Amino acid sequence: MKEMRIGVIGAGVMGGGIAQTLATAGYYTTCCDVSPDALKTAEDQVRTGRYGFERAIERGKISEEDAGAALDRLSFSESLTETATADIVLECVPERLDLKLRVFRDLEAAAGPETILASNSSGFSISALAAMTERPDKVIGWHWASPPVIMPFAEIVVTSETSPDAVQTIQEVARSCGKNPIVVNDAPMSWGYVANRVYFAMIREAQRVVDEGVASSEDVNQLMVDCYNWPVGPFAMIKGATDGWQ
């Protein structure tokens, strides 16, 4: 399994951290982006960012030797064609359906016939992405949480056509990364799978409380932390998920 090569398409807040996590778990990983600046930023974050190897070494989370080995397994590329030669390709581009559909169309043309195509979408239909390919049995959702280096969350989204082999492979990779994979069904008529549907219901109600003058957003955050032992409140979650908890 660790001889498997994995490609990550998109070097943003999520893509860079996911690539770092996969390389740390022992996989040869290529992080791809059309922007050289995005690739440089991602590499800098992997090396010296808040969740990067330098700080992880300082905190005793990883040895210098293991961090060096992970960096040796991690590469950055502007070539989607090169990245698509991997055994698994995980799409992590911005949450725009038109962009994700285009990426899956391009991956279908570039990837080998046995390559599993996964998406880190927060809620778009995996069936719609699979429809851009000739391999719907090898298309699957793998939704990560921010920051991906830390969070154990792994929402594995399957369609009626996703093969058991693809599901098992992604589950095994997720577990080897220290994640807790939970398989859920694609719901093409709704956005958000499980985690985000429940999350946004909470956010809507929290915003109603503020709009009605019942409490401030700061007080809502603190009450939820105190009552439910959350690390942060709902409004703080929005900011953290957006900026990668930097």
Regions found by a protein language model. Name each.
Residues 116-186, 193-196:
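Rossmann-fold dinucleotide-binding core
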